[in-house]
């Protein structure tokens, strides 16, 4: 039902307000959630999905799609709204079930590629790190198959993300590796749950990220979609540095009594304040109503996405004819094909094993045996390659200038390593492992838990798993870690006793 309308409101502003109020309506109906960030960041989401990203709502698994990460997972109502409007498999009824058990619209996004949700986010900073892993995957592929693999990693990050240590670890690594396909828009609204950022977060974010080696675009008006689009396109031109776009926004934008305050963050606006916000933004539509012209405008993403995918398929066919060997290699990676007969050969080798040795040495040997059969196996360690035996021999180190290396030097960044590895797994093309000492599993527990929750196939290697590590003292002696890991649902924990069990753990 239309109450009153501002005739001067263009279709883009109308679509943005639709995103705002669909988000507000979801939170109001659930009587819980976070309306503030969606109201402030709606222009960013609109710009990305409607004007920038290469994506096909009717085939969310399109291999060369741009990836989008909502690192501020509490703003999930905005993600569901934009996916619904652009033609993904979300209905208004799904939006009305926001935060309900068993719905498509849980309180924080849960990975489901068929719905357009690339990663599970909620614990702040995790999505930020996941995007770095996705960019590593993209760079590995595009460095060799650039004619058909070429996509960006976009994300909306927030003040809370940037306060988390994992984001610092991942940002530092991304700058070091020159991951130019990362473009993050920082929803800089200056508010956290406790209040103004002046209470706990006064650092100069721009200088910090420049020090990491990022290109930074400062003081961008988060309401100006033309400026946002222009800035993102400028960022795309820099393939040597990840980009951070600092978009100044207002939490709870449009709400007369809550905009710009922490009260807009984590509780419903309520029906009375929602009506005031509608009046303030001259929005005359009823609850969960989508204007017909907005529906038509946003669903244009379907046609444009299908056209882009068709172009890509034609490109793949041309590439297959002109580069059959490279195409076959890439096809095996994209489809995760193993070399035929690999399991039989592995079992034969396992039957020949008799000599006793440390299981970390056995693990290293297993890795190098399996790499011959699994062309998409990559990995590294948190600055403990020699100790954890995690080097793929004769394969080089992945770096800014050598992006074909299969060994990733994560640095002393255990938590970041976990989040980045999850991003590599979520990208969908590589099997990734990462190693450190068992006692340091505590540093990366949140990433391990999210990997299990997301049903990713990330492989975590933990060595030095005994109190027999006496000389290093109690700081390095794992006591509770093994039991702690075994309590995580969906996490398969193997603790092999010998060489054969180690190899078969890897096979499993």
Q: Model-found features: residue ranges?
A:
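Short intrinsically disordered, low-complexity coil segments enriched in acidic
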Residues: 1-2, 287
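Thiamine diphosphate
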Residues: 2-153, 296-506
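Glycine-rich ThDP/TPP pyrophosphate-binding loop and its adjacent helix/strand module
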Residues: 57-58, 65, 113, 117-300, ...
């Amino acid at each position: 039902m239309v109450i009153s309308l501002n005739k001067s409101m263009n279709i883009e502003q109308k679509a943005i307000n639709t995103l705002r109020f669909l988000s507000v309506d979801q939170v109001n109906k659930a009587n819980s959630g976070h309306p503030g960030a969606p109201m402030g960041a709606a222009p960013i989401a609109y710009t990305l999905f409607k004007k920038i990203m290469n994506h096909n709502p009717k085939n969310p698994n399109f291999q060369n799609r741009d990836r989008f990460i909502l690192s501020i997972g509490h703003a999930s109502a905005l993600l569901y709204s934009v996916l619904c409007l652009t033609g993904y498999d979300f209905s208004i009824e799904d939006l009305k079930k926001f935060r309900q058990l068993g719905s498509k619209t849980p309180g924080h996004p849960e990975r489901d590629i068929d719905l357009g949700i690339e990663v599970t986010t909620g614990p702040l900073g995790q999505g930020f790190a996941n995007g770095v892993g996705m960019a590593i995957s993209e760079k590995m592929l595009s460095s060799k198959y650039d004619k058909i693999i070429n996509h960006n990693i976009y994300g909306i990050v927030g003040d809370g993300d940037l306060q988390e240590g994992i984001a610092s670890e991942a940002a530092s690594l991304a700058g070091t590796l020159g991951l130019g396909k990362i473009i993050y828009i920082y929803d800089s609204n200056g508010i956290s749950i406790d209040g103004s950022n002046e209470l706990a977060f006064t650092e100069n974010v721009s200088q910090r990220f420049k020090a990491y080696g990022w290109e930074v675009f400062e003081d961008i008006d988060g309401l100006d979609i033309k400026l946002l689009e222009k800035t993102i396109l400028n960022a795309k031109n820099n393939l040597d540095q990840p980009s951070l776009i600092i978009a100044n926004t207002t939490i709870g934008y449009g709400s007369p009594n809550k905009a710009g305050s922490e009260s807009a963050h984590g509780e419903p606006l309520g029906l009375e304040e929602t009506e005031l916000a509608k009046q303030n933004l001259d929005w005359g539509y009823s609850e969960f109503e989508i204007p017909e012209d907005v529906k038509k405008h946003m669903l244009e993403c379907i046609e444009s996405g299908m056209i882009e995918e068709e172009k890509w398929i034609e490109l793949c066919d041309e590439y297959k004819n002109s580069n059959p060997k490279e195409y076959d290699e890439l096809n095996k990676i994209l489809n995760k094909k193993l070399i035929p007969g690999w399991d039989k050969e592995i079992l034969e080798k396992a039957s020949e094993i008799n000599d006793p040795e440390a299981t970390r040495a056995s693990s290293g040997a297993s890795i190098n045996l399996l790499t011959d059969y699994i062309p998409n196996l990559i990995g590294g360690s948190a600055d403990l390659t020699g100790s954890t035996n995690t080097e793929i021999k004769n394969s080089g180190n992945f770096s800014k200038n050598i992006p074909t290396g299969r060994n990733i030097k994560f640095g002393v960044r255990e938590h970041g390593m976990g989040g980045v590895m999850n991003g590599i797994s979520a990208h969908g093309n590589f099997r990734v492992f990462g190693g450190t000492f068992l006692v340091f599993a505590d540093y990366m527990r949140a990433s391990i838990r999210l990997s299990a929750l997301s049903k990713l196939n990330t492989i975590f290697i933990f060595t030095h798993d005994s109190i027999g590590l006496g000389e290093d003292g109690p700081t390095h002696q794992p006591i509770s870690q093994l039991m702690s890991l075994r309590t995580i649902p969906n996490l398969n924990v193997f603790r092999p006793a010998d060489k054969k069990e180690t190899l078969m753990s890897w096979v499993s």
